[in-house]
Amino acid sequence: VTWFFCFINILNCKIMNFPILSSLILLPSIGALFLFFTKSKSENKITAKYVALFTSLVNFFLSIYLWFLFDQTTSAFQFVEDRIWIKGLINYKVGVDGISILFIILTTFITPLCIISVNNSVTKRLNEFLIAILIMETFMIGVFCSLDLVVFYLFFEAGLIPMFLIIGIWGGARRVYSAFKFFLFTLLGSVLMLVAIISIYWITGTTDVVQLYELGIDTKYQNLLWLAFFSSFAVKTPMWPVHTWLPDAHVEAPTAGSVLLAAILLKMAGYGSVSYTHLRAHETTNY
């Protein structure tokens, strides 16, 4: 055991400059691209499934490795990567804390299980179904890693697209109705969050999560911002009375899609509510 932890410490020293979070985000998409460009060669369902399963398992073990490297004695964000995306406006900034790392591991653990389960629930266009799952894994991990509100929003909303396709193409008899209901409810629910993010940038001049923790926001704006974020997350959690899209989505989605929806996609809203709502409205949240 001692030798094992010594080995981990040595690797820790060498990996500090390695973009492990970006690797976790991008690896599923690389697997999806491989399946897309080798479609004619991977019509064999077993081959496509093994490629997707291998990709997701590598990501799972990479997340376990991240857990071993994670310093549990501090509450600070770790493995932070900060790169300019749009100068003076948006930075690609990712990092993890004690909450987000657990959701990342949950995501990488559930994804291979969903891929294993497709034998009985998916009988057509398996290649495209696996691509949708891998792309969705990229977006879900991106949500839990984001340290910029714009990046968080983009990953959050992008996750709707593969789930919309999973329900609409591979779902049950009422799949089209359920898919559009899911998409429209959750998309319209995000309008307030987008308005709130734009307002935060207008008030503070930044969407960087770490900087917002330090800056704070005038109390006269806090109630409105809190309400906007809470309303958006309430639709996606979902809470009564804006929960009516969920039963249809669960019933019509294939098994793997229903598992991803329940185990991870709904948790993204809860994570956002816990991690970000109080960030902009300390006093309102405490009240």
List PLM regions with ranges.
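Juxtamembrane/interfacial segments at transmembrane-helix boundaries in multi-pass membrane proteins
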Residues: D71-N91, S190-A249, G270-R280
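Alpha-helical multi-pass transmembrane bundles of energy-transducing inner-membrane proteins
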Residues: S42-N44, I131, I135, F139-I217
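Structural signature of hydrophobic alpha-helical transmembrane segments
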Residues: P19-L27, G98-L106, V150-G159, N223-F230
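A short, hydrophobic C-terminal helix/tail in secreted or cell-surface proteins
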Residues: A281-Y287
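Functional transmembrane alpha-helices
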Residues: D97, D148-I166, V235-R280
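C-terminal ends of transmembrane helices
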Residues: L33-K41, P112-V122, L165-R174, T237-D248
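Transmembrane helix-loop-helix hairpins at membrane boundaries of multipass inner-membrane proteins
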Residues: L11-S22, F34-I131, V210, E214
